[in-house]
Amino acid sequence: MTEFIFLVLSPNQEVQRVCFVIFLFLYTAIVLGNFLIVLTVMTSRSLGSPMYFFLSYLSFMEICYSSATAPKLISDLLAERKVISWWGCMAQLFFLHFFGGTEIFLLTVMAYDHYVAICKPLSYTTIMNWQVCTVLVGIAWVGGFMHSFAQILLIFHLLFCGPNVINHYFCDLVPLLKLACSDTFLIGLLIVANGGTLSVISFGVLLASYMVILLHLRTWSSEGWCKALSTCGSHFAVVILFFGPCVFNSLRPSTTLPIDKMVAVFYTVITAILNPVIYSLRNAEMRKAMKRLWIRTLRLNEK
């Protein structure tokens, strides 16, 4: 097996051209929107807290995560043959799970940061010092790498000697398992256990952290409630949008479903574009910092 053929979103050529314009616009918005958040955090002194440090890494992860699939999809929508080499498929699969796994760990780290900020405010700067923040980000990277490496290692044990048509627009685990001509039962269980355990346990830890935060907020005033919920609301919205499809994929049956491609579009493209929208619209400090960055840029252009 030297290559795989993708079945993109629609066989209709006109629909593919429309999808090309839509996904090109969405991917451009993902890169520009998330890069704007990274640039704003890096250049704004008012956004020097660990929360924004983690947010800048999350935005960078969103760019990388969507870049694992979106550019190939966009180019395939105009190509006659939607093909990818075997090694290209493995690389796409690795980076998709590497960046996706890293993002899951990073979202969990951000939940811990919110927990410390709300439940232990007096010790926040001591607990969440820059050395700890750097280590936590490093753990997220290592965790994502180990998750992806395990998935790829399992795929390498499969034999592909028959059909090479993938009923998807990128290399994903379930479609590849269906093409294997060797026994996939045990490997399939290990793949589901690896990805499912990461998604479900991380989501459970996130929910538990927010339950503890809500219990802690019972003694706060209404003003404190509003401030705390404003701090956590954006992160919780991103968590729900990201983990919803992940949990669905982990708990769904192994059969191919008609909505699989739409769900994949949601967790590879839509969530990445919603991240800058959610954080810029709900966070007053971020909006002010972006405004100051825009004013500084205009002044530099005038000079």
Swiss-Prot record:
Its main location: membrane. It is a multi-pass membrane protein. SUPFAM superfamilies: Family A G protein-coupled receptor-like. The keyword Amino-acid biosynthesis does not apply. It is found in: Cell membrane. GO terms for molecular function: G protein-coupled receptor activity; olfactory receptor activity. Residues 1-17, 72-92, 151-187, 251-261 are extracellular. Disulfide bonds join C89-C181. InterPro entries: GPCR_Rhodpsn, GPCR_Rhodpsn_7TM, Olfact_rcpt, Olfactory_Receptors. GO terms for cellular component: plasma membrane. The chain crosses the membrane at residues 18-41, 50-71, 93-112, 132-150, 188-211, 228-250, 262-281. Keywords: Cell membrane, Disulfide bond, G-protein coupled receptor, Membrane, Olfaction, Receptor, Sensory transduction, Transducer, Transmembrane, Transmembrane helix. It comes from the Eukaryota. Residues 42-49, 113-131, 212-227, 282-303 are cytoplasmic. Belongs to the G-protein coupled receptor 1 family. Odorant receptor. PANTHER family: OLFACTORY RECEPTOR. This is Olfactory receptor 4X2. It comes from Homo sapiens (Human). The gene is OR4X2.
